[in-house]
Amino acid sequence: MSLVCLTDFQAHAREQLSKSTRDFIEGGADDSITRDDNIAAFKRIRLRPRYLRDVSEVDTRTTIQGEEISAPICIAPTGFHCLVWPDGEMSTARAAQAAGICYITSTFASCSLEDIVIAAPEGLRWFQLYVHPDLQLNKQLIQRVESLGFKALVITLDTPVCGNRRHDIRNQLRRNLTLTDLQSPKKGNAIPYFQMTPISTSLCWNDLSWFQSITRLPIILKGILTKEDAELAVKHNVQGIIVSNHGGRQLDEVLASIDALTEVVAAVKGKIEVYLDGGVRTGNDVLKALALGAKCIFLGRPILWGLACKGEHGVKEVLNILTNEFHTSMALTGCRSVAEINRNLVQFSRL
């Protein structure tokens, strides 16, 4: 079977994975309304192409936090890649490095940070942090990340408690997972996921100044969906926002990411960069997100589908397919560079 689009990879990955792993990757919170709406919301947006423009040369390159990437298509933080491929995040990191894009490594990576860096020493890496109640543990982890050459700290906001993921509860998957980077990097010190001290439930806006005091890295806040929180992010001098609902895995029945993007972009008034994850499956989706103000998009589940199908090569193929589709979408709407993508290219359908 030829795999020519991201949904092909999804179908093929389902055949490769155990039921519990499929459920872990695909599952949403409660009734999965938000998970599904993340995808459906893109289809409620229509394109307004412009013609008679010279598109013989189309350039997909852009920058995030001052670093050039080959296309505005990067890899979102997802945990436990070894569930779907033996060397897990190391394969993901190598694919991202080869593609010339950014990979956000998760706190819940199944490979150590050191091994990921060794696998892809030249790659652009950010680190996603679930804030632990133990501030010293957070500090040690952030300092470790900084010393390893990660270029930004992404703090996840939307997980003060875990969402109600019914499949994971039924499958008791957590008992088979370990957390490598919440202990010493020495081998053998990983702890079971289900024994982990909970993620901090007391994190608040005033705590951001402490993080800013211990690192020189740009701080990106992941999980913002409202203009009120976007305005607070600017007020607290962070460097970026990822508009995200955690792939519909946390609070169900919230806004689709693409539906929340417009108000967040309007609220920050160009003062900080805004990114998006959730629901991107085609090059048109990438174009729509950029037209509505995202600097780039981050892929979650599709990366795991590629990894499950073919490891590093599967992730490369997923990234290549989406980048080629985006290149085509740019050409067919008259955009020769990412800078030419703007709000006039889209309208919200009345259907």
Swiss-Prot record:
User: What positions does the entry give for FMN binding?
Assistant: P77, T78, G79, S106, Q128, T156, K222, D277, G278, G279, V280, R281, G300, R301
Which residues in this protein are found as Phosphothreonine? T178
The record's section on SUPFAM superfamilies has: FMN-linked oxidoreductases
**InterPro entries in alphabetical order:** Aldolase_TIM, Alpha-hydoxy_acid_DH_FMN, FMN-dep_DH, FMN_HAD, FMN_hydac_DH_AS
Q: Does the keyword Phosphoprotein apply?
A: yes
Q: Name one Pfam family in it.
A: FMN_dh
Q: Which residues form the active site?
A: H246 (proton acceptor)
The tissues in which it is expressed are:
Expressed in the liver and kidney.
- Report any one BP term from Gene Ontology: fatty acid oxidation
Any one GO MF annotation of this record: (S)-2-hydroxy-acid oxidase activity
Q: List the EC numbers from the record.
A: 1.1.3.15
- Motif location (Microbody targeting signal)? 349-351
Q: Which GO terms describe its cellular component?
A: cytosol; peroxisomal matrix
Requisite cofactors: FMN
Q: Which UniProt keywords apply?
A: Fatty acid metabolism, Flavoprotein, FMN, Lipid metabolism, Oxidoreductase, Peroxisome, Phosphoprotein
Domain (FMN hydroxy acid dehydrogenase) ranges: 2-351
Major place of residence: other
Annotated a 2-oxocarboxylate binding sites: Y130, R165, R249
Cellular compartment(s): Peroxisome
Q: To which pathway does this protein belong?
A: Lipid metabolism; fatty acid metabolism
- Group of enzyme by EC: oxidoreductase
PANTHER family xrefs: 2-HYDROXYACID OXIDASE 2 (PTHR10578:SF149), S -2-HYDROXY-ACID OXIDASE-RELATED (PTHR10578)
Report the protein's function. Answer: Oxidase that catalyzes the oxidation of medium and long chain hydroxyacids such as 2-hydroxyhexadecanoate and 2-hydroxyoctanoate, to the correspondong 2-oxoacids. Its role in the oxidation of 2-hydroxy fatty acids may contribute to the general pathway of fatty acid alpha-oxidation. Active in vitro with the artificial electron acceptor 2,6-dichlorophenolindophenol (DCIP), but O2 is believed to be the physiological electron acceptor, leading to the production of H2O2. Is not active on glycolate, glyoxylate, L-lactate and 2-hydroxybutanoate.
Give the family this protein belongs to, as stated in its UniProt record.
Belongs to the FMN-dependent alpha-hydroxy acid dehydrogenase family.
Fill in the subunit field for this protein.
Homotetramer.
Q: What is this protein called?
A: 2-Hydroxyacid oxidase 2
Output the lineage of the source organism. Answer: Eukaryota, Metazoa, Chordata, Craniata, Vertebrata
Primary gene name: HAO2
